[in-house]
Amino acid sequence: MKTLLLTLVMVTIMCLDLGYTLTCYKGYHDTVVCKPHETICYRYLVPATHGNAIPARGCGTSCPGGNHPVCCSTDLCNK
């Protein structure tokens, strides 16, 4: 009985994500699982040609500079 209980506990631990990991957008549709020390999703605009701007997205440890930065700390919040 103890062996069965121990086995169930081990399977549960292996299947669950016990350490919370943040997921952010890296591109328009691509996502990335952040490293444990990266606790912020960011988005900012990178100037491009002809007055256009390209959004840069990803994970970080702090809010980066740039044009119109958006920083947040929940999954997929940097759309």
UniProtKB/Swiss-Prot annotation:
Superkingdom: Eukaryota
Signal sequence annotation: 1-21
Sequence similarity: Belongs to the three-finger toxin family. Short-chain subfamily. Type III alpha-neurotoxin sub-subfamily.
Disulfide bonds: C24-C41, C34-C59, C63-C71, C72-C77
Cellular compartments per GO CC: extracellular region
Taxonomic source organism: Pseudonaja textilis (Eastern brown snake)
Subcellular location(s) of the protein: Secreted
Keywords: Acetylcholine receptor inhibiting toxin, Disulfide bond, Ion channel impairing toxin, Neurotoxin, Postsynaptic neurotoxin, Secreted, Signal, Toxin
Tissue: Expressed by the venom gland.
Organism taxonomic ancestry: Eukaryota, Metazoa, Chordata, Craniata, Vertebrata
Name of the protein in question: Short neurotoxin 3
GO MF terms, alphabetically ordered: acetylcholine receptor inhibitor activity; ion channel regulator activity; toxin activity
Stored InterPro entries: Snake_3FTx, Snake_toxin-like_sf
Role played: Binds with high affinity to muscle nicotinic acetylcholine receptor (nAChR) and hinders acetylcholine binding to the receptor, thereby impairing neuromuscular transmission. Competes with the binding of alpha-bungarotoxin on muscle AChR (from Torpedo) with an IC(50) of 0.30 uM. Causes muscle paralysis, spasms and increased respiration.
